Amino acid sequence: MVEPLLSGIVLGLIPITLAGLFVTAYLQYRRGDQLDF
C-alpha cells in the first residue's frame, strides 16, 4: 500500500516542480533584462 501512495506523491510533485522551475526561470529572465545581471 506504500508504493501507490509514493508514486501518487511523485506524480503530483513533478508538475508542480516543473511549473516552479519555469516560473523562477522566467522571473529571473525578466529581472535580468531589467537589472542587467
Curated annotation (Swiss-Prot):
Q: How does it sit in the membrane?
A: Single-pass membrane protein
Carries keyword Plastid? Answer: yes
Which GO molecular function entries does the Swiss-Prot or TrEMBL record give? electron transporter, transferring electrons within cytochrome b6/f complex of photosystem II activity
Transmembrane regions listed in the UniProt entry: 5-25
Q: Which UniProt keywords apply?
A: Chloroplast, Electron transport, Membrane, Photosynthesis, Plastid, Thylakoid, Transmembrane, Transmembrane helix, Transport
Q: Which NCBIfam families match?
A: PRK00665.1 (NF001907)
Q: Where is the signal peptide?
A: none
Record-given protein name: Cytochrome b6-f complex subunit 5
Keyword Chloroplast tagged: yes
Recite the lineage of the species: Eukaryota, Viridiplantae, Streptophyta, Coleochaetophyceae, Coleochaetales
Q: Which family does it belong to?
A: Belongs to the PetG family.
Instruction: List cystine links.
Output: none
**Quaternary structure and interacting proteins, as annotated:** The 4 large subunits of the cytochrome b6-f complex are cytochrome b6, subunit IV (17 kDa polypeptide, PetD), cytochrome f and the Rieske protein, while the 4 small subunits are PetG, PetL, PetM and PetN. The complex functions as a dimer.
InterPro entries recorded: Cyt_6/f_cplx_su5, Cyt_6/f_cplx_su5_sf
Q: Biological process (GO) annotations? A: cytochrome complex assembly; photosynthesis
Mention any one GO cellular component term assigned to this protein in its UniProt record. Answer: cytochrome b6f complex
Organism of derivation: Chaetosphaeridium globosum (Charophycean green alga)
According to its UniProt entry, the function of this protein is described as: Component of the cytochrome b6-f complex, which mediates electron transfer between photosystem II (PSII) and photosystem I (PSI), cyclic electron flow around PSI, and state transitions. PetG is required for either the stability or assembly of the cytochrome b6-f complex.
Instruction: List locations, semicolon-separated.
Output: Plastid, Chloroplast thylakoid membrane
